[in-house]
Every structure is written in structure tokens, then in C-alpha cells.
């Protein structure tokens, strides 16, 4: 699973989900990519699930780049606990995604297979996504 090795502060404030992505909006490594169309928190389990979906569909011959990392902790108090008495323990690690961000990139010789693999990966993610190609960008 993707989690940070070490953090300065164990518990952070929740990140804002407003605005658009300032960086990471272009396909730079591969030929095809998945671009987020709405804000979301993507957990380390969802990233891993999408990666496995891509790898199972293409088998061998391609390369996949994961452009996001879950570096923000989300805390949650246990069920049935009264208010107060401090912040709860870290429940999961999330990546704060804003619209326009490229989440995954991929290069593969066959275009139809690559687009189908990215479509399957997009179904595992909690936000609306679209598939973009490198040559579509200016």
C-alpha cells in the first residue's frame, strides 16, 4: 500500500477540495492518461485497485505511471464515542485531487487495449474521469 514513510505531524487538517489543479495537468511520461474532472479524495486502496485493473488487462509490454500519492491522513473517531477528548486516530491516507489532474499515465503499443485498460481503471476511482492522449494537448 502507498503510505508515507515518515510525516512531521501525525494528524493534519482536512485539505480543501475547491479550485482546479495548478500542476500535473499534462500527459508527460506515457502516451495516454486518466484526467480527473471533479474534486475527490482518492485513498491508497483505490489507487492500488486501479493499478491492478490496468495491469491485469494489458498483461505485459506496457508501462504504467502513477502520478498521485496519498500523503494526507484522514482521521475518524470510533463509532459510539462522545464528542470531545481529542482528535481520532488516522483512518486512511488520501490524495487530494482537484479537477484537471492527471492520475495515471500509460504507454502501450496497441491503442484500443490501452484505452480499455484505462477505462477499467477509471471505474475504480471515486470521481468522474476522462481519458486523454498526449497529442490532444497543445
From Swiss-Prot:
GO cellular component terms, semicolon-separated: cytosolic large ribosomal subunit
Record carries keyword RNA-binding: yes
Annotated region (Disordered), positions in chain: 1-23
Disulfide bonds: none
One annotated GO molecular function: structural constituent of ribosome
Keywords: Ribonucleoprotein, Ribosomal protein, RNA-binding, rRNA-binding, tRNA-binding
Domain of life according to the entry: Bacteria
Xref: InterPro entries: Ribosomal_uL16, Ribosomal_uL16_bact-type, Ribosomal_uL16_CS, Ribosomal_uL16_dom, Ribosomal_uL16_sf
Gene3D superfamilies: Ribosomal protein L10e/L16 (3.90.1170.10)
Biased composition (Basic residues): 1-16
Classification via SUPFAM superfamilies: Ribosomal protein L16p/L10e
Function: Binds 23S rRNA and is also seen to make contacts with the A and possibly P site tRNAs.
UniProt-listed HAMAP family: Ribosomal_uL16
Quaternary data: Part of the 50S ribosomal subunit.
Family: Belongs to the universal ribosomal protein uL16 family.
Name the UniProt record assigns to this protein: Large ribosomal subunit protein uL16
Organism: Corynebacterium glutamicum (strain ATCC 13032 / DSM 20300 / JCM 1318 / BCRC 11384 / CCUG 27702 / LMG 3730 / NBRC 12168 / NCIMB 10025 / NRRL B-2784 / 534)
Protein's gene: rplP
